[in-house]
């Protein structure tokens, strides 16, 4: 396997995440604009006017850009669907990710490449063949085992199933990130409880809450599996990535458009390193374990292998929110950067800063710049071991950063 044969697709919900994905070695990014995507109600969403900048930034780095248009589409939204896809084509988008035939058919009609979303629950080669009329890449159902994925891949090859480009249909699979309790993300719980549809990009994440099962006859409350009975742990394939790509997967999709730029950078870096090790013949259980430890330092709900190993029941999270071994704390913002001497002037706003702490700068152009704080100075140049909130300080940086960047530390 050559590293160039496998595509790492990174989630992008902000310009900071876009820069981080590019820094880390992503081959492609996916994102949403407006209300026609599965993160439309999230803060991690762009507007139609952002399209040009996102595509241009990605392409300048040799990275493909995919637009998610993967919600259910209603009749009164047809014009919006056309406007979004028209704009995407005009700005040079590489493909849209869709599930509704209104989006799929219109995109193909005007010559835009289509990838079929996991919402379509593709679970066999006949369905792949059906969608190959319009799509060059399909995301198979997350509930499949690796053996089932391999069977589908064999059928694609043996039956010469090709997409509109004339090439064999590519298999894309989720490799890392959050999993939903429902089949291929088709959930009604949020709509039922809060009138916010998960299938319209407005999931209220009710499955992540703690629940108790009550015996209505006795009133006894049963504490089941830590009570997070609807919340699966996060998918992680880094410790069986050789078998994962060996099943025929060619696009590794990372979940997490609503997660931070530091998450995007760390996850892409780790999977890129694992792929390069597989290529070089140096991929070992010890290396994979080390990568998994690094993955655990950013947002996660604990890890399991998903359904790929054939387990019918999910491993449930033991945490509300993140189980990361480290958490980020906002320190302050960069008020100036002196490029010649690589020193940032930082206004410490929210938490004190001390020598020896692991820190990172984050910005739309900077992406993520991590370092250990080796030295710290007052603005008059006096060395300091720590600085308190409300003060200005000088920090020597390992890489160029920018005015307006945010500074965080890991604790």
Where do the protein language model's features map onto the residues?
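Surface-exposed amphipathic alpha-helical tracts and adjacent flexible/coil segments at the periphery
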Residues: 1-24, 28-40, 55, 61-71, ...
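Short glycine-enriched loops at secondary-structure junctions
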Residues: 14, 71, 99-102, 120-122
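Charged helix-capping and loop-helix junction motifs
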Residues: 44-50, 79-83
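Well-ordered mid-protein domain cores that form the structural environment of catalytic cofactors
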Residues: 81-117
